[in-house]
């Protein structure tokens, strides 16, 4: 018996909009970007339909989650070794690189695909020049985003296991956490900490307790922010956050966001199909934000479908439970994961890397839905 759900239907409509946006592409070089991104969404859609109809037992879900954690543990070990020892900072030509036209391979995005490495040298305040790890992923931000959405699953598996298995997942969490720090992915790291705090808050059942916590928190924050502003430390903290990777990082992002939105207004319905290179910007329009990027590339129609899918997945996880078992614990950690994903998407584009998209939709969307089938 073939089964389908409302999220799969909305995903199908999103793919239709994605197809329509193809006709808005102006740069021929961007066709490869478009089809690469489209392939990640097609893969995600097929996985959604297949897993919804095939996987219907808890052990199958757990096996899938374990496989993802093991893969990310291996990627994290590679990242930690690459950060620590120069001998592991290998570089090689990818299989795609042998078939890619030289004109495309010489571009910024094409060169990353054609020649693979486990990281690159960068600058960060307090560290100076350092090796920023990306492991098997295209960019360090993709690696940090995938680590951020996988860590809640590793914590969940640690929670439901005992003995040697529990120690293994403890080790996995530590190594993945170290690797996340070595990516210096500021937003991904912040998303983990803030997401955990919000996760613990939404887990509280007492409305009075929640209201009291919010009231005390707002009061303390008001006094603390006032003190920071009066002492001048507040502006120093802002400068530290914004310019920790240099002034160019913050200034470039600001220009990208403004010009991306202005360009979106020219084709608001179905968008531009893909990112676009413009003179004067180091990075293309539609980059550095999953939300703004989706709005730019697929317009209001695609963005509305995308946000609706995220909201539906979140609502599926907000279920009242009266027993403590693997399913109910998974719902809770699923909320943690979604909070991390929602916050991380503000400044990172997650559909550039096929591996990131695969893990994102499997553990962020499919597994909670599969668990709810039973």
Language-model features, listed with the residues they occupy:
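N-terminal signal-anchor transmembrane segment
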Residues: 1, 16-27, 341-343, 355-362
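A membrane-periplasm/extracellular boundary helix in multi-pass inner-membrane enzymes
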Residues: 77-89, 124, 183, 203-244, ...
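Aromatic-anchored transmembrane helix interface
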Residues: 9, 13, 30-53, 67-72
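Transmembrane alpha-helices of multi-pass inner-membrane enzymes
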Residues: 197, 333-344, 349-374
